[in-house]
Amino acid sequence: MLTQSQTKQEEDQTKKNKYQQFGITVAGGNGNRNGQELNQLSYPRGIFIDNDKSIYIADCLNNRIVKWELNSNEGQIIAGENGKENQNNQLDGPLDIIFDKKNNSFIISEFFNQRVIRYFYKNQTNQQITNRNTYPFGLAIDENGFVYIADIYNHEVRRWKQGDKYGELVAGGNGQGNHFNQLNKPTFIFIAEDHSLYISDWNNHRVMKWKKNAKEGIIVAGGNGQGNSLKQLNHPEGVVVDHLGQIYVADSYNHRVMRWCEGEEEGEVIVGGNGEGNQSNQLFDPMGLSFDDEGNLYVADSKNDRIQKFEIVL
């Protein structure tokens, strides 16, 4: 049994997690923006890592979802290989993807089709979750199977239960703005075990935390104007929170990933931050973030058309 001091020591060590500064390209990175081959990506956005370290990618400009298995040289198309439209087998501008374990299905946000769909890969059918008056971006799902959807142009996040027609407002919805009860183009989101919702408030250059049933959020990263100091963010995108409550955010226009601890005035650069570029220690508009079960960090390096893996330093 661990003593209190040992537990604290372990937590302190975890808080000091470092990552290799030179990323490994694990998907894409084989050509220009218009690359449609199976070894290419075009402006990847949301990602998630399966238990077997397969990477699922919203390959946005190729209008498809692709799966890259561990150590694979190319991906396989999971959804959307039939052109960009709104039919069952088509996608148009997929931005994020999550997996619903209870229903063994993927949840996909499609910006240009203004819909979120539940996609069953085995029989290649889908069900529409939202109505057509949304502009869906980031997705999250809780242990009850409720789906959270960031609506970038309605400046709100809604929670959708099975059969909902409009969803339930859980954050924002008070017009576009920078007050604590407002959002300004929310992009990616993360739901914690206590149902606190973390939102990349893109045009306010901050990450907001909305506790369950809260009427307003609190700033947990950024919020000091647009900039590149350690107190600032510049159009945040992907956001994930670890088991210690540390917030990892893709600081997109600063081409870096930052880590913030709630209550602290500034964050720290975890990877990137070496200028816009395509070297292994550089990023170019990072988007989605995800961890594997070993704690390695994956970044959708969108304008380099690749997924970068930054290994944890043990």
Say what each PLM segment does.
Residues 284-314:
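Blade-level signature of beta-propeller repeat domains, shared across WD40, Kelch, NHL, RCC1
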Residues 52, 60, 102, 111, ...:
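Short loop/turn segments immediately following the C-termini of beta-strands
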Residues 8-43, 72-95, 122-137, 164-187, ...:
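Gly/Pro-rich loop segments of beta-rich domains
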Residues 54-56, 105-107, 146-149, 197-198, ...:
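Conserved beta-propeller blade signature
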Residues 49-52, 99-103, 141-144, 191-194, ...:
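Residue-level detector of Asp-centered blade-edge/turn motifs that repeat once per structural unit
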Residues 63-66, 114-117, 155-158, 205-207, ...:
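Structural signal for beta-propeller blades
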Residues 68, 99, 116-120, 160, ...:
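Hydrophobic/aromatic beta-strand positions that recur at structurally equivalent sites within the blades
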Residues 230-262:
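Loop/turn-rich, solvent-exposed surfaces of beta-rich toroidal or solenoidal domains
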